[in-house]
Amino acid sequence: MSRLSRNPAFPAIAIAILTGLTAVPAQAETTKDRILSEKSVTIGIHNRVPWGYLDKDGKVAGLQPAIIRAALAPLGVTEVKFVIGEFSTMIPGLLAGRFDMTAAGVGITPARCKSVIFSEPDLTSGDGLLVASGNPLNLHSFLDVKNNPKVRLAGARGSGNAAHAIQAGVPESQMQQFQDVESMVSALVAKRVDAVVMSAATIIATMSDPNVKGIERADPFIPLKNAEGDDVAMVTAIAFRPDDTDLRDLYNEQLNKLKDSGELEKIILDTGFTKNNLPPNKTAEQLCSAPEQPK
């Protein structure tokens, strides 16, 4: 028998050696693994129509929750929990682990791409017009407004939407600036203005109010183009933590299936958007490296 085998400490040494040879470092559970195993995902919403909000029954509704449900349900993820916060807290809350992904209409911008990773685009939300029912002046673009000097256009003071109208050539003499959405809509209903410019999402939120009557969305609407010929618009997507690339990639696979089947378009139209708001033919990577767009 060897000296080592006669050593009383030998069994402990042998166990330690074998344990060291066979032990495998424990792998931390990823967000994707947890979501798939628990069949549940938690999303961040800012409780605003049409992005992500609570309906009259207290259930989460809106465009992006509907897309997330449709994307993840085939994987067995059928429970959608939510955390409500201000829009400004969406990215900080995501990074702090308060929820797994955003569903708040967060636009893809180069600045935001430095903090989070995005899914492929799910919507284009550009400018739009609210007009009197029947669109009596046949307004479908800023050019239509510009070409009719009698048209009085309302815009929110300091908004990008009003700035786009001016940039498109609408004379400032035709623009009336208001403090908020409510005052603009009241002016349109009272026929003090002929049209109101605001974002497509704000139009949907406005028209969801059953008390708003006598006005409609100008459809279609031809938006302002940038120097590259693309619509001047916010492009939205779902935001993820930078470490959750596997979750983002899985979500993108499911999102592409929704696009190919036409289900994404149906969700977009059912939410109140139009075909003008379908996602662009650009990737999140391209948008992350593009010049800044409206937020």
Give the residues covered by each predicted segment.
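Extracytoplasmic small-molecule ligand-binding "clamshell" domains
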Residues: A28-G105, K114
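Bilobed "Venus flytrap"/periplasmic-binding protein-like clamshell domains
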Residues: T42, N47-P50, V60-P74, G128-D180, ...
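Beta->alpha turn/N-cap motifs
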Residues: G44-V49, V83-S88, G97-T109, A132, ...
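Extended ligand-binding regions for polar small-molecule ligands
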Residues: P65-L75, N135, L143, V151-R152, ...
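Acidic, polar ligand-binding/catalytic clefts
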Residues: R69, K81-V145, F221, A227, ...
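A ligand-binding cleft/hinge motif common to bilobed small-molecule-binding domains
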Residues: T89, G105-K114, I166-Q167, D194-D230
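Periplasmic-binding protein-like
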Residues: T124-G128, N211-N252, N276-P294
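Ligand-binding clefts/hinges and TM-proximal coupling segments of bilobed small-molecule sensing domains
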Residues: G160-M175, D249-K295
